[in-house]
Amino acid sequence: MITEIRHIIFSNDELKLVFQSVPLEGFDPARRITRIQVVEGPPPSIRIQSEAGGGRAELEVESYQLARLMVAYCREKKIPLPKDALKTIHAQGDALCFSIMSTLG
């Protein structure tokens, strides 16, 4: 049996693009993201600080939401992801590592 493991690293800047391009309940993508903080887990989460019209807001995004957003973002960017693969997320400094493990053959 052969196992393939891939790691997709989402930098802090790329995470901003994720939240501006993939819909997330409770977050308006038109808001200007001022800060993204990766909170180490387990499981990891993200705190988004944003502002619009003079008002500031902070939103905590849990790991199950992050996984859904990352899969949607990869689809949008045409990054292939096997459906049946094991997918995990972990913090890597101020970035997130999206790991995909699948069994081949």
Task: Label every PLM stretch briefly.
Residues 1-105:
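Intrinsically disordered, low-complexity linear regions
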